[in-house]
Amino acid sequence: ACVRPVKAYKNTPQRLSDKNAEKIDIVVLRECTEGLFYTAAVHNRNKIANNDEVEDIMRITRNTTMRLHNFAFKLAEKRKQKGKLGKVTCVDKANVFKSQALFRKIFNEIKDDFPNIEADTCYVDAMALNLIRQPWEYDVMVMENIFGDILSDLGGGLVGGMGMASCGEIGDNHGLFQPAHGSAPDIMGKNKANPLATILSGS
């Protein structure tokens, strides 16, 4: 799972004027090996029909999705012990895509194994709105790869920008931790890089 914390820190600029913005403390979870990115050109799995048409596939499998949702609920349990909301929100587009309907179906199956954790669902377009209106009402959010890529960047913007965004890619045996913005070579030598994302990734 790709773990993207979105947390407001004291003495940092807040993008939202509501005083509740100080309470923002979300974790965005996305699955890194499937979803729409599964057919990215780097994997050579997209279908090029001709110069005017290209097809990509959104791949969702039960086994991988079960692991992701289990990870989400177990993370919410740990966070609840530390005083967080103890809530998991499945973010999807189940009303349009069958692959997303499966993603939500598996979520609804697994939530019964964690009765002490609140579980709800939200369409991704509605969540984009909710993250601007009331992000402090969310805890752990779990979603397909491309949705997580987009919404986690939105979350970074809420708490001061990508220089505040850490990232962990956690597998069964290993983890990779890095700033969400990558190496950012475009700002090298300009004396404006924010080191906090790197520090947070290492903590």
Per-segment meaning from a language model:
Residues A1-Y9, D113-C122, M164-Q178, M188:
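Short, acidic/small-residue loops that bind anionic groups at enzyme active sites
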